[in-house]
Curated annotation (Swiss-Prot):
Possesses an unusual extended V-shaped dimeric structure with each monomer consisting of three distinct domains arranged along a curved 'spinal' alpha-helix. The N-terminal catalytic domain specifically recognizes the glutamate moiety of the substrate. The second domain is the NADPH-binding domain, and the third C-terminal domain is responsible for dimerization. This is Glutamyl-tRNA reductase. Keywords: NADP, Oxidoreductase, Porphyrin biosynthesis. One of its GO terms (biological process) is protoporphyrinogen IX biosynthetic process from glutamate. The gene is hemA. NADP(+) binds at G182, A183, G184, E185, M186, G187. It catalyses: (S)-4-amino-5-oxopentanoate + tRNA(Glu) + NADP(+) = L-glutamyl-tRNA(Glu) + NADPH + H(+). It comes from Haloquadratum walsbyi (strain DSM 16790 / HBSQ001). InterPro entries: 4pyrrol_synth_GluRdtase, 4pyrrol_synth_GluRdtase_dimer, 4pyrrol_synth_GluRdtase_N, GluRdtase_CS, GluRdtase_dimer_dom_sf, GluRdtase_N_sf, NAD(P)-bd_dom_sf, Shikm_DH/Glu-tRNA_Rdtase. Belongs to the glutamyl-tRNA reductase family. During catalysis, the active site Cys acts as a nucleophile attacking the alpha-carbonyl group of tRNA-bound glutamate with the formation of a thioester intermediate between enzyme and glutamate, and the concomitant release of tRNA(Glu). The thioester intermediate is finally reduced by direct hydride transfer from NADPH, to form the product GSA.
Amino acid sequence: MNTGVICGVRVSHNRASVEEIELAGERDSRTIMETLLTRDGITESFAIQTCNRSEAYVVADGAVAGRRALASFAPDVRDGAVVDMSHEESLRHLLRVATGLESLVLGEDQILGQFKRAIEVARGIGALGPMLEAGVTKAIHVGERARSETSINEGAVSIGSAAVRLAGQSVGLNGRKALVIGAGEMGSLVAESLASTNISEVVIANRTIENAESIAETINSPAYAVSLDSLTEVITEASIIMTATGYGKYLIEPTDIDGAGETFIIDLAQPRNVHPATADIENAIVQDIDALESITKETEASRQAAAREVDAMIDEEFDRLLESYKRQRADEAISEMYEAAEHVKRREVETALEKLEKQGTLTDNQRETISSMADTLINQLLAAPTKSLRDAAAEDDWTTIQTAMTLFDPNFGGDTPQPDRPDDIPRAAERGDISGDDLPDDVPNHIAEKVSDG
């Protein structure tokens, strides 16, 4: 059976500090997914990391196996900052993340691009299977619907523009020189926001200088690019510094700022790019993403009505997603049932034809008649069980689905050889292939008794 149970875990800005999010995101998403796939009982994995969240999801044989695998996700983060999510909680949360309802900036667009890139990484390493592929694809669909059918992102500030607004409120921007460290999506947003102010000049520093040059050439402000090798020289010239790299190390140390004039620094990177002790330097003001909350709240009120619309949209799409999973599970059980019946049909038709051939040669039409009769019998006999399995899935009766899989799928639930038909069960017990413990609860009593006695 290809389906399983989804389990999730998250460390995000709602409950965790910047330090705790950083701790949970010490490993990149690719490494997290690859590691989770090595855990017992895990068949799929997905992870997404941004500056204000680190999350992981798995598909497991059962909830216990899923929680056990995810226990290693953020072992050093305090319990109150780590949120475990059940199957349905995980799916609903994925939809909320993609729509921007879980973002620090309500409805911001940046998360959708980050979500898509996380999916690309997961697909690239083969971490997604039918369960999570359906979940993340639905999340992207809902995220795009939310932005095209509601005003959830109208008037929304990005994290980058919120950082620029905070700098303006704190120390002013007029005539100042700004340094942006990082030329990725976040760095680009910061640079564009700075260019729309009265800043005098923007310097973009990046490990790959060509990317920094591309931003410097496109923003509407005097700007130039430097490599990270030249960072020390330009740090002392800038009075506003914003970091937004995924470099994974401190790029600004206390000694880099000591002796400089008034310097306002916002560290948007995850992991952080600014050494915490830098905040102790005189004339240095160091802020992180937590400081942006007051800015984001200013524009959030106007989007609350849209947020309610998106919530209703999520409810609708969430129900559709659950129904698709139910159909998938029922279809798999039905497929196994028909495959098992087809196996028996082929064997019995072959036996019947051999016996009839001994009585005289059969024509092709006679052979076709016998085979067609067998097909008709199977379809008629399995029509009622097929309906029962679909009804069971619709009613969340997974015991019936599991029983069907156990009876009809030889590989379901382990490597125990399964008998071809119920009457063979006692003989299988005599051979030692199965025991009473291997049987589903609703196997007929007279058969179960024979197995137990065997």
